[in-house]
Amino acid sequence: TILSQQESVVNAIRPHLLPLQSPVDLDSLIDHIGTSKIVMLGEASHGTHEYYTWRAMISQRLIREKGFSFIAVEGDWPDCYRLNRYVKNYSGAGDSAYEVLHSFNRWPTWMWANWEVVAFAEWLYDHNKSIPVNKKTGFYGLDVYSLWESMESIIKYLRRVDPAALEIAERAFYCFEPYQGEEGTGYAYASLLVPEPCTQEVVNLLAEMQRNAPKYNTDQ
């Protein structure tokens, strides 16, 4: 039965459980992470207080004790970059994390615009205060739902700082243009039928921006 299967799973997991009652209970996890450069933190449900709170505590220790330099979340890049500007103490970035997160407007807004993220962002803001600009810990979004907003932000930026790379960015944008208005799902379906339709354009853009990264000395 389903109940017996669930009990079997619970019984298999129980010997490996580690109680989480205080921050020191994370010690074994932090030790186990060792010298890893990437740590992926998930959740069983979006928006659950306990997951967000413990994930924030883990992130804080990774930043303080392991030297981690950025947080990447399942969020829209343009929106999350506004929060990134705030936690890095950039001029004109907003007066509070609450104010910045209030601008998140894509459903589900509560996924990141919640009090747990506000608290973590304010901690990150304080943590970054005494750190050199190039060493501050950032906060970035990498979800594909903001495909069009992200591409428009890239084009707007390159139009001002790197006209040569702008042409490459526009080629990538035009490749995706037939699928605009479909939140990327149209492109996903098309990629099943047409091998690598826009891959090379995106790779070319990424390579060009990485090559020129040292001269991109502005965050706008």
Where are these regions (language model features)?
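Structured catalytic-domain cores with a bias toward divalent-metal coordination
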Residues: T1-Q220
